[in-house]
């Protein structure tokens, strides 16, 4: 599954946030991978808006696996002061963002359609096979 989330970094602490993420602890990287976090990226807007993206089999399970690691506890404690909404630990204060479009999913769905695309004539209500309509138009133009 694909997961997108957002949070907020204090704008005055963005440079420190970037610096810490430029050299994430190797044991934290390994823990994320071992917990099932794949293709994980963070994006930081100029106003402190943080967008995260990851792929995993089961987000709640991947998050739960991270929650029990010692390194995650240390990392979250180090990062907590950088977040604007610091009532919760940083890894629990994410707002999940709904995915509304994915190119590959829609292309795969379109490729799996076996029947020609059909539309309904607005005047007569008749079903029109667009492949047949295109063929008839080509014959008329010849």
Where are these regions (language model features)?
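Glycine-rich beta-strand-turn "strand-cap" elements at beta-sheet edges
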Residues: 45, 77-142
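An amphipathic, aromatic/His-enriched active-site/gating alpha helix that lines ligand/cofactor pockets
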Residues: 35, 56-94
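A broad, low-specificity signal marking well-ordered, structured residues that form hydrophobic/aromatic
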Residues: 3, 50, 95
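Hydrophobic pocket/interface hotspot
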Residues: 5, 17, 21, 52
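Short amphipathic alpha-helical segments
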Residues: 13-38
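Short, polar/acidic, helix-capping and beta-turn segments at strand->helix junctions
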Residues: 14, 43-44, 55-60, 101, ...
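Short glycine-/aliphatic-rich beta-strand segments at the starts of folded cytosolic domains
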Residues: 2-16
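Short, glycine- and small/hydrophobic-rich beta-strand elements in well-ordered beta-sheets
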Residues: 29-51, 55-57
